Amino acid sequence: MEELRKKKGFICDMDGVIYHGNRLLPGVKEFVEWLYREQKNFLFLTNSSERSPKELQQKLHRMGLDVDESHFYTSALATARFISSQAAGCSAYVIGGAGLIMALHDEGITMNDVDPDYVIIGEGNAYNYENILKAVRLVLKGAKLIGTNSDLTGPAEDGIIPACRAMIAPIEMATGQNAYFVGKPNPLMMRTGLRILGVHSEEAAMIGDRMDTDMVAGIESGLDTVLVLSGITSRSDIKKFPYRPRLVLDGVGDIPGVTE
């Protein structure tokens, strides 16, 4: 634990680590206070593409936690940055929330439902049969298929909801084209997170609640990994995977010793 506390940078997942639904998880406030007090570099990194950093900041504020907007990085931002680096000034047909559309717009990517360079799928309420059909036809005409993340499901207060991978699957199956996923566990998103923090992977830790995304992302990017049991994964689930986190904790409150 002392080795973890000496890390200069912390990349933290959000849902299941910081909050669940609209409820702040135990020990989180003390953990964030510790990050500030110890002058740690930290980033809340989420595979969700629906909300902007400003909206995430406001959500935490409503829960009584004040964190600067600069500490948030989403798969929408990662996707927009990736596409802009590949084809600056390109166009896209998008199925997703406002956070994704805003991120793409800020990178100079225009919306196009006739002959786009890319079809980009995120999460949101805009998903229906008509836009699936349009996406299929555009991909068959040559548009490249991008998913903001490869999560099959996401957490909800009353269970789970379909996430990006589940929503993009019909388009992949109908077109025979495999999507490229930008978010975790793609090391691309993690490397960008480390650059934002200004730390080397050996000086940072990845904290998350999912073995299939958070822990893989950390391991493949060279970070120490910390699995918290405050989210989707139970201790008995860990043995199902061929890899292990460096530490397993009940929650982030264990890191500064809140529960000790």
Identify the meaning behind each predicted range.
Residues M1-C12, V17-R37, R51-Y73, A80, ...:
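Asp-based, Mg2+/Mn2+-dependent phosphohydrolase catalytic module
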Residues S48:
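Conserved phosphate/oxyanion-binding catalytic-loop motifs
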